[in-house]
Amino acid sequence: MSSKFSKIGFILAVAGSAVGLGNAWKFPTLVGQSGGSAFILLYIILTLGVGFVIFLAELSIGKISEKDPVNAYEKLAPSNKKAWSYVGFTMVGAILIVSFYTLVIGWIVKYVFLSITGNLPMDLEVSKAQFGFFISEDFLSQFICFTLVFLCVFYIVSKGVKNGIEKLNVWMMPSLFILLILMLVYAISKDGFIMAVKFLFVPDFSKINTSNVLEALGLAFFSLSLGVGTIITYSASLPDKTNFITSTLNIIFINLLVGLLMGLVVFTFIFEFGYIPNQQGPGLVFISLATLFEKIGVIGCIFGAAFFISLIFAGITSAVSMIEPFTFYLINTFGMSRKKALILIGIVVYILGMLCILSSLKSTQFGFFGMSFFDLLDSVSSKVIMPLGGILAAIFVGFVMKKEALKILFKPYMRGIFFELWYVFLRFISPLAVVIVMIAAFLK
């Protein structure tokens, strides 16, 4: 890359990549339905045992090589360089993800507009019908919103690491926290807040079962943007003498904190109106919450707009991180300018995004293997490419890279028994855990 992050810029950029839309609609619901703080404790343990371990492996690849994923594997492999370089192409998964991710952010833009104009639905059935119409029949709105988000995301990446990605995250991540804190202050005054606290934090170990352990294991891996080259790419711009162990723990903490703050805000309103939090996924936000915000009146419109804007912030910081790995690769390998690289990537992302829209419309509906094109991209990226990329990164660092090179990198920040423990987890425990998640995802 042409420039490096500042120390705080690196933390906020990677945290921005990790903090995504799932923090609002997946993580809080899983916590509440799976044992509250018992699930949180399980999630933290698995994050440190799996996510943290593989995160440091990918960080090591990026920091030592200072290359994009493809060239990083090729540079560091002592033999079979070409074969290992192909592992770097798991960054294609990031391109697939950003194609439908920008579309979902576009949906949120639509709901910001509905909030501001006071046109959110007042009834759950109406809300379901409105959202269903929007994604299955309203091509024009989806096209406009998707295009706006697409242009915004690619403009930010075009500015580079320092002036684009870092500036975005240095501004957007604190803004996200400010919005969440303001919404939390308002939520505290509501009767539903106590129920939300109990739902999220009162431990119920009886709810911990094999299914929940697998869910927590999956979250521990996927919530850190592993397996698609993002961490390798960002770490190539990690400033020297940065305590990356502390930085990684800070990133994990920020990700967890945003999820819990989102959960408190979301479920305060869910419980305030006597709803049952049985939805997980976009429906929780676009159907349940949209209805509740409208019921509150003018304050609800303001609150709804603030909430949806906070989701846009979380989504854009993640989307930006997914474009950078392939951009960096094209610049490194073919000597392209950043502008030309982004035009090529942009064409692919835009076509895939438009296909996602068309595959869900009633008039142009199509799919593969019983799934819409949208769901296919989601499944291929999250169930195949991401876990495969993480497993191969762990194997590469644990069995292919020289241990002495890792010791030198880690020496100022983690040594002795702690380094050896991380190394054992990296070689044997963490990859096996991800294999289990991968198998469980297919069986599900």
Locate predicted features.
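Hydrophobic alpha-helical segments and their helix-loop junctions in multi-pass secondary transporters
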Residues: 101-123, 177-200, 268, 352-360, ...
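Membrane-embedded translocation segments of transport machinery
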Residues: 2-4, 8, 166, 170-316, ...
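Loop-to-transmembrane helix boundary motifs in multi-pass membrane proteins
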Residues: 2-3, 9-10, 17, 143-144, ...
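A generic transmembrane alpha-helix motif of multi-pass inner-membrane proteins
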Residues: 372-396, 415-444
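Transmembrane helix-boundary motif of multi-pass solute transporters/channels
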Residues: 6-46, 232-235, 245-249, 253-256
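Inter-helical loop and helix-membrane interface segments of multi-pass membrane transporters/permeases
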Residues: 29-34, 69-89, 102-162, 194-214, ...
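Helix-loop-helix connectors at the membrane interface of multi-pass transporters/channels
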Residues: 105-137, 237-241, 246, 250-258, ...
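Membrane-interface "cap" regions at the ends of multi-pass membrane proteins
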Residues: 1-25, 54-59, 63-88, 239-243, ...
